[in-house]
């Protein structure tokens, strides 16, 4: 491999991923995926555009119907991130367990507050379930968004998080 390619990979990948891919080191990563010192607080950048990404979880009403316990279920997450070139600034992460209508209101509200015109929602049955409610909410509020399907390529959640965010966090 060209040296430039190796250097570029070392600056964009997490150190664990780089060692695994380029040095054939298959150590386990104890102590968590992210290190506390990788998280940096800063003022909101002037430039950039907001992106909203949603990872839906079960909705409260359907959970009650199936007698599922709240404490064992995942939460819906709504990430509000400003992107300027290759820099990300996380404004907020809205998370919780809500009924499907309240979830739709929270998604639309987040997008309206930061004037984002599109929202990405992770593909799957839960995305399909919320779309009609989100469309109703957009119609009621007369606020329209482009709804983008976010695909995960069949990878496990922990792998997606590690590969997509770990290197970015480690290298700033």
Which residues does each predicted region cover?
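Short beta-strand micro-motifs in enzyme catalytic cores
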Residues: 52, 76-77
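Generic structural signal for beta-strand residues in well-ordered domains
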Residues: 44-45, 71, 112
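ATPase catalytic-site recognition across NTP-hydrolyzing enzymes
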Residues: 1-67
